[in-house]
C-alpha cells in the first residue's frame, strides 16, 4: 500500500528541494536555519506514511504533518518566482532591484502564512436564490441551509464549528443539510463534531450524507447511528418525503461516490415524478448522472472551492479544476441544478487562499 503515499511523498520532496535552492540562491547567510526546516518537512513525511504512527499524540501528529505540507507547498509556489528573479538579477544586479525582487520571492510564502493564520478562521454566510422553473408554489421561498466539509481536527476546533452552527441556526432555515466530511481521520473527534451539529435547528429537520473521509475510516454507520440519537438523519442511499403545504419535497442522500466507478447505482428509482427531487451527494461528480435520472437539485461539497485558489481574469485557478469542472458555485444542466459549497475545513494543507470557508443559505425561487 506504499503507492498510496507516493503523491504526498513527491510533494514533500519537491518542497524540500525548492526550499534548499531558494535558501542557497537568496539567503546564503542563513544556511544553519535550513536544516531544521528541512528536518521538520521530513518529519511531516514520516508522520504521513505512518512510520511514527502511535508514537506521537494525535494532535501533534496532525499539526506537524499539516504544517509541513503547508511549508512544502509554499516553497514549491515560490520556486518559479525564484527562478525568474535569479534570471533578472543576473541581467541587472542593482542592489535596490535585488531587494524588491527578493520580496517577490517571499510573497507566496507570506500568502501561505496568511492562509494558515487568518483566512481559514472566518466563515462567510453565503446567500443565494436558486431560480427553478416549474417549482411548486408551496416550495417558493423555502430556505435551505448547508454546512459541509467540516474536518473537525486540530486545524478546526469545536469552538469554530460552534460559530458556524450558530450562523446556520440564526438564518432560521426550513431544512438544514450536512453534506459530508465531518472529520479527516480516525484520530479526529467525530463524537464532538456530531454533538456540536446536534445544535442545528431547522423547522423541517436536519439531514445529512457522508463524505469520503467517513468512508476512509469505515465510520458511516457509527456516525449515522450517533447522529440519529441527536435528531440528525443521515440518508444512506435512502429517501424521505417532506410536506410543505400541497407540495412534496422528495429528499434523498447517498454515500460517497468514488470516481471511476458507476455513479448513483440504484438511485434512479428514488426519483418521484411530479415532485421536487433533491439529492445530497458529497461529491459533485454525480451531477451529470443525476441530471439524466431527473433530480431537480443536487447539494454537494468535497472540493473546498479549490482551497488554494487564484482568480485571474475571471477564471478560478486551482488544482481541483484538473479533476472536476464543478469546483464551486451554481451549475445548470437541462432542468437540473447543482450547488457546490466551499465548506468549512481544510485537508492536507491547513490553509485557505482565495477560497474562504462558508456556510450557505439557499432560497428556492419559482422561475
Description of each model-found segment:
Residues 135-367:
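Soluble catalytic domains of enzymes that build or remodel membrane lipids, polysaccharides, and related
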Residues 88-107, 114-146, 153-166, 170:
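N-terminal signal-anchor transmembrane helix
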Residues 1-121:
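Non-catalytic terminal accessory segments
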